[in-house]
């Protein structure tokens, strides 16, 4: 397995241009329909049991896309303001984790329908965030522990009301 912009893929055939089978849901939930031959993608191989973890665990199961609303370029860093898909809003917390285009990142300030990400020089230099611009779509994978916690609390609260 490997991931392109955070999208987990299985190779269907190997050769001079690996072939991947993509499910319809993958095409609907990701930015794949918006990329071109010249687009730069973040590529990453699956981790192994002895791989060092440099962030939170990322599965490659994309939950949706977010539109880049603003890019603030600084000397070596960048700040991005990204629209949160409405169905994912409840999973975004200040200092929580999110994977954007496959990169494990920490959430900055959360607004009503958007959030900030502050990219460090290393992330800007080795990812496609170097070329990100307003209007681009970014793949979003919400951190699984956050989803599990929110959903458990919601279920317990509903059971207590009943």
Features from the language model and the residues they span:
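Short, conserved secondary-structure segments in the cores of folded domains
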Residues: 28-31, 53, 88, 94, ...
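Glycine- and charge-enriched low-complexity intrinsically disordered segments
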Residues: 39, 45-49, 139-144, 151-156
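Single conserved hydrophobic/aromatic residue that forms the stacking wall/gate
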Residues: 1-20
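A structural feature that tracks compact, well-ordered secondary-structure segments
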Residues: 13-14, 21-22, 71, 90-123, ...
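Short, compositionally biased
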Residues: 24-27, 55-66, 111-118, 122, ...
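Anionic-ligand binding region
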Residues: 64-73, 79-82, 88, 94-96
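Ordered, amphipathic secondary-structure segments that act as subunit-interaction surfaces
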Residues: 22-65
């Amino acid at each position: 397995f490997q991931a392109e912009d955070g999208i987990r893929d299985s190779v269907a055939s190997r050769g001079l241009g690996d072939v991947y089978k993509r499910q319809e849901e993958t095409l609907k939930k990701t930015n794949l329909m918006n990329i071109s031959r010249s687009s730069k993608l973040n590529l990453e191989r699956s981790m192994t049991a002895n791989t060092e973890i440099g962030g939170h665990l990322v599965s490659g199961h994309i939950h949706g896309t977010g539109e880049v609303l603003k890019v603030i370029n600084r000397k070596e860093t960048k700040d991005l303001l990204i629209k949160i898909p409405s169905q994912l809003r409840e999973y975004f917390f200040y200092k929580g984790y999110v994977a954007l285009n496959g990169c494990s990142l920490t959430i900055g300030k959360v607004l009503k329908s958007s959030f900030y990400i502050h990219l460090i020089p290393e992330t800007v230099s080795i990812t496609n965030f170097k070329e990100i611009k307003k209007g681009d779509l970014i793949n979003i994978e919400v951190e699984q522990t956050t989803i599990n916690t929110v959903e458990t609390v919601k279920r317990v609260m509903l059971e207590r009301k009943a």
